[in-house]
């Protein structure tokens, strides 16, 4: 990863992403900011489960990744870091950390499936 890419990812804000233009499994990423905000708060277990389902179902479907997926992963990575930090004192954060780790484990093999490896 280049330093330029790392800087972009580090400073990217949810509002900077043109979610309405990014395709997902079921449409566009227009609702991603609201779902990410619910996850970031880690307060209401029912709302967190619903938001997480909406995001993950739209980011990966039948081993297909969508245009919104890389941007969603940036923010889910940040949320995972926060959830891991708070998981000892917040049961919602503990639940969310486990679910995000499972989702990341699901995404990793899919992302490698779509790589084109150089041939000699």
Predicted regions and their residues:
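N-terminal "cap/leader" segments of large eukaryotic alpha-helical scaffolds
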Residues: 1-46
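HEAT/HEAT-like alpha-solenoid repeats
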Residues: 36-41, 74-81, 85
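HEAT-repeat alpha-solenoid elements in large eukaryotic scaffold proteins
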Residues: 48-56
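Positions within ordered alpha-helical repeat solenoids
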Residues: 57-61, 78, 82, 102-110
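Short sequence/structural elements of tandem HEAT/ARM alpha-solenoid repeats
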Residues: 67-74
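Short secondary-structure subsegments characteristic of cysteine-rich extracellular domains
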Residues: 86-108
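Conserved small/polar residues in nucleotide/adenosyl-binding loops
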Residues: 113-119
